[in-house]
Every structure is written in C-alpha cells, then in structure tokens.
From Swiss-Prot:
Its main location: cytoplasm. Belongs to the uracil-DNA glycosylase (UDG) superfamily. UNG family. This is Uracil-DNA glycosylase. The active site is at 66 (proton acceptor). The keyword Cell inner membrane does not apply. GO terms for molecular function: uracil DNA N-glycosylase activity. The gene is ung. GO terms for biological process: base-excision repair, AP site formation via deaminated base removal. GO terms for cellular component: cytoplasm. InterPro entries: UDG_fam1, Ura-DNA_Glyclase_AS, Uracil-DNA_glycosylase-like, Uracil-DNA_glycosylase-like_sf. It catalyses: Hydrolyzes single-stranded DNA or mismatched double-stranded DNA and polynucleotides, releasing free uracil. It is an enzyme of class 3 (hydrolase).
Length: 222
C-alpha cells in the first residue's frame, strides 16, 4: 500500500487507527492480495474517497458496502464509476430518484460522481478493496473498523452533516451518529432488488438540501 496517500485533515483524525495492530495486519493482508490477484480499485485509489473530500469540507456522507468488483468499474468512490463505463443498475436508480425528487437530471459526469464529491459529498465504502469478481472478499479483515472510525470522527467532531444510509448494512451505522447533531436519512438500497420497496420516493436529495439550507450551508447540486 505504498502508493496510498490520505488527505491531511483525515490523516490527523485517523492517525490513531494507522498506529493500531489491526491496521498493520490489514496493510499486510491488502499488500499481499495486490501482489497475488487482480484487486479493485487500483491501489492508488484505495483512499480516494478521503483524498477527494477533505474532512473539514464534508457536508453529506453516502455509505456503500464494497467496491465494484468487475474490470474498470471501481474508482475508490462508493456507487461511482469512471466516465465512459456503463452506469450500474443501482446508480441508474439513484439518478432516477434524483430526477423525480428534484425535477432535474443528475449532475454527474457519465457515471462519475466526482461533481458531487467536489461539493462535499463523501462517497465511502465500508470495505475499501475487493478481489476481482468476488463480492465481499475483503470483508472482515479490518476495513470496517477503519471506516467506522471515520464515520465516528465525523459524527463527533463535525455538526449538521447529512448521512444517507441505504440498505440494511448502511442503516446499522446509524447507532454511531447523534440525530440531535446530524440528519440521518434511511431507505432501502437502490439496487433493482429493493429500490421499489422505498428507495424510490424517499426524496433524500431534496430533504438533504432543505436541511443544509436550514443550517446556512450551501446545498448540493445533485
């Protein structure tokens, strides 16, 4: 993981995690995985969610579970794919909800969500790496501990953030977040398997912006 860098603000709040034994073991595991197998995202993008959205600039957190595990899709940002790559079904459903909620098409670049990131949307997967074609293959090796620490740091050190928790896995993270200090919005996952059970019609994008405006924070152009 020599290629990995992390933004200075995040480095400061997560320094204790880097020094813990679990992170040392995680580093050894991930380094060996990259040596032996095709792993996604490319190593230089492992911490891209943090690098592209500095700690002090986060306004909204969208939690994913795993990076995409097929060639060319994962770029270190939850739900996002590089421009030119076909848009995955969950992201298509997210775009559809934005259109019906806001009355505008999604402000994204193909399937890349960098235009959101640049406005302060942290696109964080709970597990930051995955073996090619093996969903969930890097779960349970320490990434979840690390990304939980990131969520807790935001929840405790910042205020008036919006946490968008889609699906049962993400919704479990609500226990770490004080609802008196932040807005927590929960819905089923935007996957085709569950989007019709309440993701469609959740209006999370307009509700996020209403909350941000209420607290004097510039809204997101979704």
């Amino acid at each position: 993981m020599k290629e990995v860098q992390i933004e200075a603000g995040w480095k400061k709040v997560l320094q204790e995690e880097f020094d813990k034994f679990y992170f040392e073991k995680l580093t050894d595991f991930v380094r060996e995985e990259y040596r032996q197998s095709p792993i996604y995202p490319p190593a230089r993008f492992i911490f891209r969610a943090f690098d592209t959205c500095p700690f002090d600039r986060v306004k909204v957190v969208i939690l994913g579970q795993d990076p995409y595990h097929e060639p060319g899709q994962a770029e270190g940002l939850a739900f996002s794919v590089p421009t030119g790559i076909p848009i995955p079904p969950s992201l298509r459903n997210i775009c559809e909800e934005i259109r019906t909620d806001t009355g505008q098409p999604a402000h994204i670049d193909g399937g890349s969500l960098l235009p959101w990131v640049e406005q302060g949307v942290l696109l964080l997967n709970a597990t930051l790496t995955v073996r090619a074609s093996q969903a969930g293959s890097h779960q349970g090796h320490g990434w979840e501990t690390f990304t939980d620490a990131a969520i807790e740091a935001l929840a405790k050190r910042r205020e008036h953030l919006v946490f968008l928790l889609w699906g049962s896995y993400a919704r479990r993270k609500s226990a770490m977040i004080d609802p008196r200090r932040h807005l927590i919005l929960e819905a089923p996952h935007p996957s085709p398997l569950s989007a019709h059970r309440g993701f469609f019609g959740c209006k999370h994008f307009s509700r996020t912006n209403a909350y941000l405006r209420q607290h004097g924070i510039a809204p997101i152009v979704w």
